């Protein structure tokens, strides 16, 4: 098994698309590990210091994910080396998606990822450059639909991911109008953990959790895991951390989700990162959720 994994990790990706912006220092890569099933999928991320190797690694991770959970397509990822707080971010994304438009049209599907918002950035910008939906390429390359089928299915996609959650069981606040895209990845993480403990360890209730990262994935996962009766005992992000060996209550978790500023963990009780990073690994916990940027923290 180890030899197979090493062979998989060391195999060159099928397609690597490299881009250099003409107006800023931004540079980016689309890495498509394979076009298994006629298409590949993986989100778009942006951060300073990102390099091609990180994107390659994430594309391979996406391929493992699709192999396990479907659909049977290849793994891919897009990454842009640029400061997401730069006021030129929207312009950079527009030029990026204009450049990769042919891939997105026929065999590559993308979405939001680290520092790139699916609802407010990916969907409107890709639409502006001529893509019906960020997943159009997967639908075209993998399912090979007729034109009427394509119009119908992509219409359903367009409506589905931006749908506001109306059931109070699935959102920390109806007033905040969280969408499916905001919460679905964290929900999937929580469901995977819940099913694992349901199958092998007499249920998830009471199990203790540490979360690394408090963006869309980490915060949503924390919300749903807490709903299952699991105890979030620690949260660490680049801003700092929160520790409570007894576990944060559901109302406390809800408030931490609602008080986020983008991907930032916000709390009057926030410990400095150095202190939190020293103490959090001494907590007693059964579950660790790595939901931060790649290689952000060292254990």
Regions found by a protein language model. Name each.
Residues 22-24, 35-37, 51, 216-217, ...:
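Short, glycine-/Ser/Thr-/acidic-enriched flexible segments
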Residues 23-36, 67-72:
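N-terminal glycine-rich anion-binding loops that anchor highly charged ligand groups
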Residues 49-58:
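Active-site cofactor/substrate anionic-group-binding motifs, chiefly glycine-
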Residues 275-287, 293-299:
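Rossmann-fold NAD(P) dinucleotide-binding segment
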Residues 67-204:
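Glycine/serine-rich phosphate-binding loop and adjoining beta1-alpha1 elements at the start
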Residues 1-20:
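Short, Gly/Pro- and small/polar-rich lid/capping loops
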Residues 167-282:
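Glycine-rich phosphate/diphosphate-binding loop of Rossmann-like nucleotide-binding domains
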């Amino acid at each position: 098994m180890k030899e197979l994994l090493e062979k998989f990790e060391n195999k060159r990706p099928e397609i690597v698309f490299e881009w250099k912006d003409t107006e800023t220092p931004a540079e980016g890569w689309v890495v498509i590990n394979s076009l298994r099933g006629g298409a590949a999928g993986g989100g778009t991320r942006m951060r300073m210091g990102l390099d091609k190797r990180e994107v390659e690694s994430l594309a391979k991770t996406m391929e493992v994910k699709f192999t396990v959970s479907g659909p049977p397509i290849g793994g891919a990822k897009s990454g842009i080396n640029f400061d997401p707080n730069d006021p030129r971010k929207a312009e950079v994304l527009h030029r990026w998606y204009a450049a990769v438009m042919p891939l997105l049209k026929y065999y590559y599907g993308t979405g939001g990822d680290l520092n790139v918002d699916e609802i407010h950035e990916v969907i409107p910008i890709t639409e502006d450059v001529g893509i019906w939906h960020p997943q159009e390429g997967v639908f075209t390359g993998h399912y090979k639909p007729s034109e009427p089928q394509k119009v119908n299915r992509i219409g359903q996609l367009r409506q589905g991911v931006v749908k506001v959650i109306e059931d109070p069981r699935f959102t920390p606040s109806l007033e905040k109008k969280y969408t499916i895209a905001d919460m679905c990845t964290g929900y999937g993480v929580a469901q995977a953990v819940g099913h694992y403990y349901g199958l092998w360890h007499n249920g998830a209730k009471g199990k203790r959790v540490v979360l690394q990262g408090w963006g869309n994935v980490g915060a949503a996962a924390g919300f749903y895991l807490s709903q299952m009766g699991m105890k979030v005992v620690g949260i660490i992000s680049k801003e700092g951390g929160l520790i409570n060996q007894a576990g944060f209550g559901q109302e406390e978790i809800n408030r931490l989700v609602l008080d986020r500023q983008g991907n930032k963990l916000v709390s009057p009780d926030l410990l400095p990162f150095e202190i939190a990073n020293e103490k959090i690994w001494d907590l007693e916990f059964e579950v660790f959720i790595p939901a931060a940027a790649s290689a952000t923290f060292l254990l």
